[in-house]
């Protein structure tokens, strides 16, 4: 049969090709119209081939097919009885009808059409290959897009994909068999009609928008293709159709799945929340209400219905607001879940409303209103609303932090919950690189650190986390965080903050960040230099909680993991009424009697702040205990027990902060505060050396509770009055203890007004106390800052006892005291005042000591000249005899006065006649002119010295003259033993002047004899002449002597620098060394001439002896001894100098003053400004 078919096909090849070409041209020209007519004609011609023919064709194929595949291929063809399995009944009837009607014309038409189709397929082979490549590209692109859509959706089940793959395999096999069947069969019309019918059905299902020409061309290409390629091509086409079906079906499934949870959400919200609770319980999270089963058992059906109506999301039935209010009013049972949910919603509204009204002035008022409501039940809502409000308005962060600080002082668990949520929010934002959330949360944490709600360790951890990975955003967040809490961190832990600033400096030097961020770092350093003056830690109006009343939470970034979001949801409470009553009682204790008043009774913000601070202090509870009439035992056993407990707590604690917390928890009464302070002071005094633990502890206690400041002030005043009762060790410990309190400003500096430093009230114990007290203050503050503190106007009145300015004697004593303890720099003002004081004292008419001493000599000068002359005329001898013993006393006083004047670089001036007013005026003029070159301190000592220089008026008596002269000689002998060289010079001068003095004595004797003989003749004339001559001589002698002595003393008082003095000594030593050689040469020359040896000893006396020759060894030995002596002196000087704390120049002047003038000296060193007075 195959051979006959092949022979019949050969002669018909050419016409078929021609027809195909003509058909192709016509199809191309006609376009869509020809394709439509072609499909309409084919619809009527349905395949009705016999089943046996199909089976024979399948068996004659080159490759074998299994039976199942054969049956599947033959399923669509009708059997002999006319039935078809796959087609519906109508189709099978139509096929039978067509087969019977067209049976006569069938064989001729089929042969012609099959030949034409084959010729057209050969001509269109090239166009088919091109179209195939394009189809492959499109199929690849669609497969990719489908794979991405399927991966994104992820909702297609595995079973569906398996069924789809099987269906694809079946259809591809059917297609391959049909195409192969068309090639080996004579009646090609059957194959063409079946395939076109199938394509039409697929187009109807999909509703594709492609043109009929394109589908027709693809159909023809599929016919032309070889049997090996045809299954793949058909497979790709079928896959496209299946993909479209699968995508549409997938979308439907996804839509169904999305609609399912909406129905579930409409269920009861209460049970959904309780399921969450049960899940949290299984995970180990806390739940107060028990498991879900217990809660479901507790709620009745009636309560559940009302709860569904009020709390479900859909709202149940459509309820008007009036009807909803009526339903809510009917619910009065507080134990029901509906009532509790309504109360919770009302609480949520109140909290949101109050938090939105907060500002700087109304913080205290709003916190009081919040504390009236049960914020313990709504703590989750409260924290959530505060965080949300702070995120929306970051400028009010400090206000929200102050409100949280007040709530935290009363309910620490609420403050801890809010802080945990903030930390978790910051960690999540940091992980997601959300800069805005990081800024808001870190800003809030910084202000909580300032309010002492959060510990500073949390702030340091956040800073290290941000700076470890220095990006632009991280550094910007760190800078804003440091600006807000930098002032507080520098107060608490300055070293760690300094390390963070060093890291920022390194980041700035690297220059890897943006210029804007680098500029921000520079601005931060400038803010730090200014001391964060524009970024204060707490504003005064927001410092509402005392330090001792605040509870600080120590949280770490790693520890905080669970934010407790379940507290934001509603939970049913069995004991609702009892819990509400407990909270009301607690709020009354917190707010006091004002808790029951109306909101308008709180008044302004300032009054509310004071009321809140009084509540915070907790004094009302103590007063209630005293007024309740309870008997308080204040006998000794209680005091002993108190001492024991305090002593044990002091010894058991490792840190002063821990100890302060424990001591403040003891809740001491007001009468026990003085005893408490005294116990602390006794424990400090009993130590061998001072321990800073006690100073830090008292500072902490005084800052936590300011009522302890006054007892410590009273104790300080008592100790200043009773220093003689204490041991030196206790005195030192107590003085250092109070110095620490003053340095830290724990107590005010006004307590120093009880100290008086005068010569009359000076006691050794008090001096020891003041010495150690001031030295400890200088160690803490430094001399410059301490002096600056003392010069403030506030302390001017309190330091009048320590630095007196009323009396020069007290001034001098205070200066000497402070210089002796090494604090002479404090007394610069007193030294200047002492220089000015003697000038102003005589001019003033006050009753000071200066005026009283200066007024004494004026009384002696009040006598007139006439009275003196009358007295001295007749009673010269008597006056001399009477005044001789008084002169001795006066001269002894003169020696003391001269020593004082020599110590203060001054000269002594004698007054000869008090009778002569003219001579007195001249003397005062010379005195004032000479004193201009001398320091002002010398004038004061001269003024204080007693006036004992008045001479006797009985100058006519020779005996008085002789005695006066002899005593003058003795005075010169007593004065001059200070210097050996001066002695020698004065002895030589005395030896030269001795004959002149003898002659003078003789002359005076002759004058006396002549005067005695001529008394009877002319008493008055001789007396007057002799008096005038002798007065003139005495004036000349006094002036000459005073001038010479002034010059000598002034030269001695000219202070020379230590370096110049050493150079002078070295020159003298060098001259002394070379003196023996000069004397040797001179003596050798004298001996040659026959003259005696003219060598002089150290005193200037000549010696007649030979000079002993020195050997070199002896010279070396003496030099070494001299060096040893010099080294020992210098070593002792350096040791004393270091002990006194002086420089070399000061020590040299000090030693000179101690040796020559043990009264005063002043250093000329520019660096030291050291003065010493005695």
UniProtKB/Swiss-Prot annotation:
Residues 348-531 form the MIF4G domain. Keywords: Differentiation, mRNA processing, mRNA splicing, Nucleus, Sexual differentiation. Residues 1-15, 79-92, 183-200, 235-259, 910-924, 1095-1118 have a biased composition (Basic and acidic residues). Residues 36-47, 93-102 have a biased composition (Polar residues). Residues 16-35, 138-153, 597-608, 840-857, 926-957, 1010-1020 have a biased composition (Low complexity). GO terms for molecular function: RNA binding. It holds the Pfam family MA3. The M.domestica genome only codes for one male determiner Mdmd protein, which is encoded in the M region, and can be located at different loci on the genome (chromosomes II, III, V or Y). The M region contains a cluster of tandemly repeated Mdmd copies with only one intact copy: other copies are degenerate with large truncations and frameshifts and are assumed to be non-functional. The presence of multiple copies in the M region may preserve its integrity in a hostile non-recombining environment. This protein is encoded on chromosome V. Belongs to the CWC22 family. This is Male determiner protein Mdmd(V). It comes from Musca domestica (House fly). The lineage of its organism: Eukaryota, Metazoa, Ecdysozoa, Arthropoda, Hexapoda.
